[in-house]
Structure formats: C-alpha cells, structure tokens
Amino acid sequence: MKRVFIAIVALFALVGESFAFIPFGHQTIAALAEKYMTNKAKSEVQTILKENMTDESVWLNSLRNQEATAYTKDWHFFTLDVNGKSTTAAENDGVVQLEKAIAVLRNRVNESDSLVSASLRTVIHLVGDMHCLSHIRIDGNEATKGFDYMVTNEGVGKNHKSWKASWYYLWERTFVGRYTFFTPQYYADDIDIYANSKKSAYEQGTPRSWVENGGEDVVRALPHLHTTELIPTQVIQLYEFNHTKCMAKAGYRLAALLNDVFK
C-alpha cells in the first residue's frame, strides 16, 4: 500500500503551485464538503493538512506534471466494465487509488505523517474527479475517452454561428467557468440551495457505487452529444443541471466520507 505513494511522499515538500485543471471546481466541492463536516473531522483535516482544505483540493493535479510522479496522471480516471460496474483492480485506476488512500487514513495511527497527508489530499481530489463525467470511462465505449462536437446558436443568415466544443471541456470548464468570479464558498452555497433536499440520498453508497452512478449519467448524455449533427446551445445549457447535481454529490459524499473516517 505504501509503495504507490512513495514518490508522492518524496516530492511532497517540492510541490509548488498547482497546474490548473478545473481548480475552482475542486475548491467548490471542498467548500461544500466543509459545510457538512463535523467539528472533529474539520479539526483532524486541519491538523493533517496544516493548510486550507479548499486550497489543497487541487494538490494532486501538480504531481502529474512532475517527472517522478507523471504516472499519477491515470489516477484521475475511473473505469467501468461493459456492464457499467466498477470491478477494476488496476493499480492506476482512480477508484483503486482512492480506496488505498482511504485505507491509509483509517490506519493513520500506524502510518507516517507524510503518507497520511498525501493520502488525505488524494481523497479530497479524487472524490471530485469521480464526479466529473469526462473522467469516467466505460470499457467498449470509445466515446467515453473524449470527443468533439459542433454547437450552433441557430441564428439565421449572418447571425448564424457554429463552433467546435468537446466532451472534456463541457464537464470540466463550461459551467464552472461561469462562477469563477465568485468565491468557492459562494458557488458551494448556490449548489447547496439547489440540491440540499436530496443530500441524504446523495451521500449514501461507496466510491465504487458513486462511479457507477456517474456512468449512468454518461450513458444518458452520450446519445445527445456524440453526434455529427449541429447541437443547439439550448440543448447544451440543459446539462448544467446535471453538472450541478454532480458537484453536489461530490461535496456531500466527500463530507460523509471524511466524517466517517474521522469519527
């Protein structure tokens, strides 16, 4: 278990500014989680991180750009089998690394401080990643590895415009980008207002069932987006509701997980 984190621990003190990969989205998920964490969990997290949890939510992204830890790039993706089930035992799969990091936290009294710190940062980040639909891949479905599509404003004559968009950009930046002039806490509050009535239902389950749940969303969305036809902007906007739901699930589930680990 320790082997998979050894390079991370070795570089821990060397990592500086995180490279941007929807940092605001991860920070918002962490901010939402903090709203529902117990005082004990918050205290434990603060003691381990010695930094703000919201800021540290993007730490794992910086490792994939370090030569010694470039292998962690694959950890950000989650694979389902052809039946949409999370059965993988692959060492480089996100859900496997998440489970390993959770195990370290549960056994933290017997682990080094560096390993526990790296594991907590890994948990915070990967719970966010698994709720980004472009990070879920389904065996036998090449479209889940990413694709481009064309969008139109449906204007007439000179007012008509069309442009290329991508599956990755849709889930990672399109909707989050509208809120980046606010604070993560403000965006988290906005998401909470929208989704709080379903919080109890959303926070149930395990990391593997959460990925499977996301896979169901992927399967529903693909037929409408993986097409050679022009897609009206109105259709794209409808997916903001789905995106907000995914963000809410991530925040609520992260809080529930950390509350359980640090109970």
Report residues per predicted region.
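Positively charged n-region of N-terminal signal peptides that target proteins for export
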Residues: 1-4
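Repetitive helical segments and hydrophobic/amphipathic motifs
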Residues: 11-12
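N-terminal, motif-rich segments that launch catalysis or mediate targeting to/interaction with membranes
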Residues: 19-126, 133, 138-263
